[in-house]
A protein has these predicted regions:
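Structured-RNA-binding interfaces characteristic of tRNA pseudouridine synthases
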Residues: 1-231
Length: 231
């Protein structure tokens, strides 16, 4: 439906739609700053953003105005007055992502845009063993989708949960921050372990290699959702 968060000329993006509506409210262009840049196909239940507005409307009235004019696929849950120096991206202390896979021959018609389809049943216990090697502050260069990344690729991941609920395998990640496509590459790698292609211990070698080619594929965007941003 949208080409990700970040505004792009001639394309529908979340940032672009928010700025268009708020620009009409303000009567002048505005700059909406998000907590991150979700890719096309990725979802968010709790994206946080900040914007400077000069208006007499209350936060509730701003929320209602936005929800009246935004596309049906975008909803503003809450508007709050922030501190003058608040920055949705740089002030974030942590993020929680969820990745959902559907296992089975019957397609999930109503949820098809929010899950990734698997034609095999991954071994959850094997994936949990592999995930244990990914916890802590480590160099995740092998799990970075940007080959020209010049900044530090060291990140802290303090929780990886993997559970099976009937026909769903659900991954939950929490960390202080994530590299481009990092969560999707982590999922793609864990699924390779879950289907028996790699042993759980091989994840250690992938980390030490600091080479994107050693990790698994980038999992499709549909199953990924930003669940929470900590401040």
């Amino acid at each position: 439906r949208f080409f990700g968060w970040e505004r792009q000329p001639g394309k529908d993006t979340i940032q672009g739609k928010l700025e268009a509506v708020l620009g009409e409210l303000q009567g002048a262009p505005v700059n909406v700053i998000g907590a991150g840049r979700t890719d096309a196909g990725v979802h968010a239940r709790a994206m946080t953003a900040n914007v400077v507005l000069d208006t007499a409307l209350t936060p509730e009235e701003i929320r209602d105005y936005m929800n009246r004019y935004l596309p049906d696929a975008i909803a503003v849950r809450e508007v709050k007055e922030a501190a003058p120096r608040f920055h949705a991206r740089y002030n974030a202390l942590g993020k929680t992502y969820r990745y959902t896979c559907h296992v089975g021959a019957v397609k999930p018609v109503f949820d098809r845009k929010y899950v990734t389809l698997l034609d095999y049943e991954p071994d959850v216990e094997r994936m949990r063993l592999a995930a244990a090697y990914l916890l802590g502050e480590q160099d995740f260069a092998s799990f970075c989708g940007n080959p020209r990344m010049k900044k530090s690729t060291v990140r802290m991941v303090d929780h990886i949960g993997i559970e099976q609920r009937r026909d769903r395998v659900i991954f939950t990640f929490h960390g202080t921050g994530f590299l481009q496509n990092m969560v999707r590459i982590l999922v793609g790698t864990l699924l390779e372990v879950g289907r028996g292609y790699w042993e759980p211990e091989y994840v250690q070698e992938i980390l030490l290699a600091k080479d994107r080619k050693r990790a698994g594929p980038t999992a499709p965007p549909e199953g990924l959702c930003l669940m929470k941003v900590d401040y």
